[in-house]
């Protein structure tokens, strides 16, 4: 047992037959340092603990024994005097609270012995339940009388499962110690215990009827007795563990109590008799409430432990548990359930309102004054301001009583003493039921039970802490609550506090705080609402507002669904960030298509603006901008059309004196394949068209030819523009610098989209138009039809009365070529084209590209002045110094006059096609101009890139989350800047709803190793257009597994890119029909069934999908799991054969059913969908 003369706590507790907590508490009181039950203490300390425990237990047992003997033999007055003496010693309450009350093992056996000595021998149940204890009064003041005794008969409460045994003893009289004047009571009578508890109860009730007094006295008596009855198990007198078992048949019963003093409360027990037993503690009751366990009373009063019920409440033996909570800490809920204590009214004139700081209307004690320093209640009773709060209850204002703190361990022990003996029954269930029935039948007629409780009383919203509620038990055990429901508003919600029950951890009790503190852990008997009335009402209102929800009407449901569908549709539609208007007007349908809206939305918007429009009605630019801005989409005029306008006049005022005639610049425009380049070849007598890739022009060709007119040689400068739709910007640049526009229209094809575009460009540049109707030699050519179509575009031929020159020509057979040139010269002479060749050159960059040998190369058209080799010029934001110039034939020239196209070398970087250039006298001036332009150009380029990449973030994220958005990264390198622009413009026209094309880099020039590294890092595909690979680029591409695609024709390039975008799309599943069969017989097989079928068309395949139709209605859709023919499993059965069909999930076949077989196949999606 010992190690180095030491002993462990748990060994000492085992020797003393105590719990570890008792030893720990004793060690704490003796200031012995211990931490847990496994701590070691010296033998000397162990001896001290044993002496302390034995001393306390002997004192408690001795005090209980003496009080029982005195109650039997002495006069009440003598009892009072002795009680006062006992209570005058202040050491007793402290020892009781801190030493005696927490010793559970010491409380069990002595209690049984005392009980056996005081119990009638007629009852054979173990642990007879009745003892008599004399509660002696206490003097609260020197000037107060010291009389009053009360003797009650209480059953043993050791059996928690049979709480109804409490009902067999009705209280005779109960009063509490008070400073009021008192009168002497009759002597205590010794009576024999009744043979059974029911008869005893009847005798007690008969005595009550004979000695009935007013209702106030009864309420006090019943409340006091209720307190004693609930706490009687804690107040059985103790004896030493070695004392013999004393048996005695007689019991002590209280003498008839005088009813004249209804408010005298003398149940102040002798401190020596208040020894706790294994269940609950007995405590002197204070009128209207109970003290906290283990907390001393006010000055001069006894130590009130575990007070019983308030006066005015019925005797709560076996009453149902409190609704919404458990009993006091450590005390298990009552089981079985006693009579339903409905209607027991509160003290006269006052409903017991839970949570109120004091009870109004309770009368003062007659013939006496209240306790010292306590003012009277408004109704005559004492105002309980001096009492400290109960643990966890709302703080009562004005509390001034001094209470002694109690350690958490002691408070826990007081509250859980009932748990140790809950399995020792005293009364059997049969006897319990008999006693309950007897008690219910023999209740005193003057019992204060309310016979008509409010049937509509609403239960407060309290939840039970324990789910062990017995059936048949009621939810109310306090008549004051029913009274409050009848007289007040519906009961407010109580504060949500934790009610400690029998299953709660003891650590919770230990940490529940000391007395005088506000703690959130309460015993059920002390629970009170914390909030005031106004706060409860406020907290209750929001819950009422959300209880009922209006039912949605049909119209609201339809409206909500329509809004959801519209929102879903809007989410899928990706509106453009901006729209570009290529022409002056658009129809309503065209505008709706550009805005990704329904035409009805556009019409509705116009209607609200006072404009009535139809789908085919054209809208001007101002109206288009208004409608588009309403939907949050800005409108930009076609940049191409703006580029076609001549923004700078090349002729200045200083040039007027030196002006001479200059050759006209003629731009040939028209739809693709209408013969523009062939017409120029006929004029130049060359074969350019045959040498172009794909037979189409993809660059601006600048040529100067000489033509003899009226025996004079005239120079003409021609610009050949691409006719493909991708080269709109090129056509616009050609129109910007032109003097005369030649519109080529095929006689067999008529006006096409690019034809109309060329007309708009020419009109934007305000240049005259000469129409060349080509291919008149072809079959089916109709020049008149072309004239008719052009007249619809306000181009009326001269022979039709208009002012537009139209010449039918044949480029292949060179018919009417001279007439066309004459008409061009006539028109140019009318324009009076002049320039100053003596000034510094000014002009426009027609085309530019990066040559791997020559570097940046630009095709320049001099419009005024003379350009010489060595000149310093600024083309937009690019600085250059002319190193060399060559003409269209490749011949090197030193200077170029007005209207002369040349290729110039010597630029710092590739200039932008369409920029205007100007020669400066020195490089310093040129650099200053270029610096300013470069800053502006960078800002503009950045804005354009952000605008082009700006995709709606909401739609982008939505599509990415749905897995619908795919990206195709490209790096674009082309031979010239114009080709880069054309390709980028074409890529912008591709659908981007599900696949987004990202061009990470686009520039003219050859493909370099830097491009390969970028493509490898970003997972991009390199697109090369009419360009080559730099040295080492091919090897780097192979090493990094980079895909390089080279193209010479823009058609093929765009087709491949579109195919790659479609390859990123998920394929569609399309249903493909296989065949149809008819059910002609059914066969039951096990739990399922087989359908005998005849194949009417197509075939049936095993594991294919099928639908079963009955009377043209689909009754099943699933898979064909079994397919047999002549008891053999087959993969498929063709038309005209019979077979057996089985489905695992369908067996209700019927003759005449039609089986439709189908399967799903994948279909490649296109971007058009």
From Swiss-Prot:
Entry's Gene Ontology cellular component terms: cytosol
Segments for region (G2): 695-699
Biased composition (Basic and acidic residues): 71-83, 92-102, 157-171, 472-486
Entry's localization field: Cytoplasm
Domain of life: Bacteria
Biased composition (Low complexity): 196-214, 265-281
Gene3D superfamilies referenced in this protein's UniProt entry, alphabetically: 1.10.10.2480, P-loop containing nucleotide triphosphate hydrolases, Translation factors, Translation initiation factor IF- 2, domain 3
Main location: cytoplasm
Protein name: Translation initiation factor IF-2
